């Protein structure tokens, strides 16, 4: 039934990788089962043979989906099946997309869809790297005009050594989590998070990862040669040189002048006017011309004008030199009721960032294939349409917003205090209110400021900067703090976040080949200078966390009780703790080791909760006098509550110093009495005496102190 499948197995660091095709999804353009030590991802590629007429963009879609059966689980929820992509799935889809997109040729507009499905997972092997390898292999055997294959590698930094594809366990000890992808001679994509490493260490990790992944590229080339799929008969559309010359004659000089306008919206208005006038003039001359083709040629001319000016050493679009950072404006405490806030403005890019403190109960529970985990630091990025002067749909976050939020979070994570140092869940939200390039890095700066304003004891200020590159043959210019146009028209987007002493996050997307180690080194060094400048301005506004948190934030008080007492504080069916939280207006969390965290915005409420917990957990001591309440009467004596949940018996002979015939003659239920603890037997029963309490009091005996546990 099946033709003989093609299988390629090779060693990749400590892992064994297997690529297999020919058995499953034979109606797809290409399909590969990629396996790395029991983590298996099935990747399909489908390309449409015909492009949509008049389409001027490349419709590539990458879907990444994790099936819970891969980990031997059944999904939660009412429907018991997988739903919309999680944040993690969205991020890995972007990770696959970014290095493959620039390898399709200009002019190729056929629709292509990649679907990567995780079908088996080894908890120690993350599925992202093998998903990228599987995608590369599937594209390599698809026959599509794909200028690959690519390799992918994760790099860790453990005990001063670079480690290829570290396991989940090793990553916990690593100071670096870096993913690099590229072809045999070029790095195309880097995504990383670091514990404040130097620029040299980051670059060494990128080069190491690129060198190591050559084994993957070699194996995929051999795999593709064995499959031997015929290449598609696709020919790049012929260039309309006549129309190109006409557009240049009408627009080039005017575009050069338009790009002297430094204000973004005014420049856009002028360029739009030129485009409309050129299009109208050409259509008046020949009605048969394609408007979309005119616009594409006009856009390409814009790109040429800007790039030529930058390579020539002229001032940039907004008048800056190549290594200048735009004007900065930094403000903190801009919103009165938030726990922390900042407004960070860099040129025409602006972020309003807030920090909110919550309890451990507010932590996000993330249900991953490898297990459940809690995240106590959340960072969300919003990019509303008004920030670029447009109208648009407002709803759930798009892929780009999720990706930018994660990048900003990576930049800040290294300086966040541990839950033990700061027992709060922290949520940061960045609202982009203006955008003209590098809004994710503005979010990093604003987040650092808002956290300090909220009193979160971060280890250092963090700033981010976006770098760009324009390269023509052997000439290149590295640009600091790029504008949106420079990002769009350039060859590289290179974002670096870090403190004054090192890098915390690095993201790189390269659109061309030929980016050398020297160019990356120059970009990193130039980024460091820009970062230090931004940090100096930020430190003038706020250089350390405020000494106290906001009056509107919950204050968390920590106390410790005996593990045996946890059940007493919780009560039967949670009755005691529920009553405590309702009556004191606090939030109470109890950990397995007896640590209790009490959160309240009102200090008196917290004190009352602490007092009551101390009462509940206090131990009865022999020889100590307590003030208790008579709980019930019996013929042989009375039961008295001396501590919450702790009753003792006053025998009829211990009520008074004379003979008592009837208990009710001396006591009533609810009456407060002083009693002395005579004995606690082996079964924990407490024997009390009223008459000895009176005698001891007369002798100036010590009355029972409050229970001992102390709260911080």
UniProtKB/Swiss-Prot annotation:
Residues 623-691 form the S1 motif domain. Its EC number is 2.7.7.8. CDD domains: KH-I_PNPase, RNase_PH_PNPase_1, RNase_PH_PNPase_2, S1_PNPase. One of its GO terms (cellular component) is cytosol. Residues 554-613 form the KH domain. It catalyses: RNA(n+1) + phosphate = RNA(n) + a ribonucleoside 5'-diphosphate. Its main location: cytoplasm. Component of the RNA degradosome, which is a multiprotein complex involved in RNA processing and mRNA degradation. Involved in mRNA degradation. Catalyzes the phosphorolysis of single-stranded polyribonucleotides processively in the 3'- to 5'-direction. This is Polyribonucleotide nucleotidyltransferase. The lineage of its organism: Bacteria, Pseudomonadati, Pseudomonadota, Gammaproteobacteria, Vibrionales. The gene is pnp.
């Amino acid at each position: 039934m099946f033709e003989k499948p093609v299988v390629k197995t090779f060693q990749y660091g400590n892992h064994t990788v297997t690529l297999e095709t020919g058995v499953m999804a034979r109606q797809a353009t290409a399909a590969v089962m990629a396996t790395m030590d029991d983590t298996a991802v099935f990747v399909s590629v489908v390309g449409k043979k015909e492009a949509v007429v008049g389409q001027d963009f490349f419709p590539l879609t990458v879907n990444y989906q994790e099936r819970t059966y891969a980990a031997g689980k059944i999904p939660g929820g009412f429907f018991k099946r997988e739903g919309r992509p999680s944040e993690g799935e969205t991020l890995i889809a972007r990770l696959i997309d970014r290095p493959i997109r620039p390898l399709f040729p200009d002019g190729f507009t056929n629709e292509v869809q990649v679907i990567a499905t995780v079908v088996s997972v080894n908890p120690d092997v993350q599925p992202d790297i093998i998903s990228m390898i599987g995608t590369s292999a599937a594209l390599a055997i698809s026959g599509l005009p794909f200028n690959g294959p690519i390799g992918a590698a994760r790099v860790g930094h453990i005990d001063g050594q670079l480690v290829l594809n570290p396991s989940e366990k090793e990553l916990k000890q690593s100071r670096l989590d870096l993913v690099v992808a590229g072809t045999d001679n070029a790095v195309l994509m880097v995504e990383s998070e670091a514990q404040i490493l130097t620029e040299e260490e980051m670059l060494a990790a990128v080069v190491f990862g690129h060198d190591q992944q050559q084994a993957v590229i070699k194996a995929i080339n051999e795999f593709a040669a064995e499959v031997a799929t015929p290449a598609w008969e696709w020919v790049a559309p012929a260039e309309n040189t006549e129309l190109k010359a006409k557009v240049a004659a009408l627009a080039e000089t005017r575009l050069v002048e338009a790009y002297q306008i430094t204000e973004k919206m005014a420049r856009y208005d002028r360029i739009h006017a030129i485009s409309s006038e050129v299009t109208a003039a050409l259509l008046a001359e020949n009605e048969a011309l394609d408007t979309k083709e005119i616009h594409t040629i006009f856009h390409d001319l814009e790109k040429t004008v800007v790039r030529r000016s930058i390579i020539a050493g002229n001032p940039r679009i907004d008048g800056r030199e190549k290594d200048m950072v735009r004007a900065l404006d930094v403000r903190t405490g801009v919103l009165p009721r938030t726990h922390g806030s900042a407004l960070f403005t860099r040129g025409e890019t602006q972020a309003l960032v807030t920090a909110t403190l919550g309890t451990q109960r507010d932590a996000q529970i993330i249900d991953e294939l490898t297990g459940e985990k809690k995240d106590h630091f959340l960072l969300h990025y919003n990019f509303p349409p008004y920030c670029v002067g447009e109208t648009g749909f407002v709803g759930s976050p798009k892929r780009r917003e999720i990706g930018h939020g994660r990048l900003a979070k990576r930049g800040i994570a290294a300086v966040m205090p541990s839950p033990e140092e700061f027992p709060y869940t922290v949520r940061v939200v960045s609202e982009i209110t203006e955008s003209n390039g590098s809004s994710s890095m503005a979010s990093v700066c604003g987040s650092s400021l808002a956290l300090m304003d909220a009193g979160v004891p971060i280890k250092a200020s963090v700033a981010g900067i976006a770098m760009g590159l324009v390269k023509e043959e052997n000439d290149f210019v590295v640009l600091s703090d790029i504008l949106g146009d420079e990002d769009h028209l350039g060859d590289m987007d290179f974002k670096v976040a870090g403190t004054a002493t090192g890098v915390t996050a690095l993201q790189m997307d390269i659109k061309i080949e030929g980016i050398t180690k020297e160019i990356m080194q120059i970009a990193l060094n130039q980024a460091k200078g820009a970062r230090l400048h931004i940090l100096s301005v930020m430190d003038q506004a706020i250089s350390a966390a405020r000494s106290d948190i906001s009056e509107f934030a919950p204050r968390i008080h920590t106390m410790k009780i005996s593990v045996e007492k946890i059940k007493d504080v919780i009560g039967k069916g949670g009755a005691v703790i529920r009553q405590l939280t309702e009556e004191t207006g606090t939030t109470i969390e109890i950990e397995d080791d007896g640590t209790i965290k009490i959160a309240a915005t009102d200090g008196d409420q917290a004190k009352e909760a602490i007092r009551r917990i101390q009462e509940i957990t206090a131990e009865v001591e022999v020889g100590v006098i307590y003030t208790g309440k008579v709980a019930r009467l019996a013929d042989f004596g009375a039961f008295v509550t001396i501590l919450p949940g702790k009753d003792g018996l006053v025998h009829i002979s211990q009520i008074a110093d004379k003979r008592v015939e009837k208990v009710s003659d001396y006591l009533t239920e609810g009456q407060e009495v002083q009693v002395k603890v005579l004995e606690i037997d082996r079964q924990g029963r407490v024997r009390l005496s009223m008459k000895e309490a009176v005698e001891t009091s007369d002798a100036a005996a010590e009355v029972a102190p409050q229970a001992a546990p102390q709260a911080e």
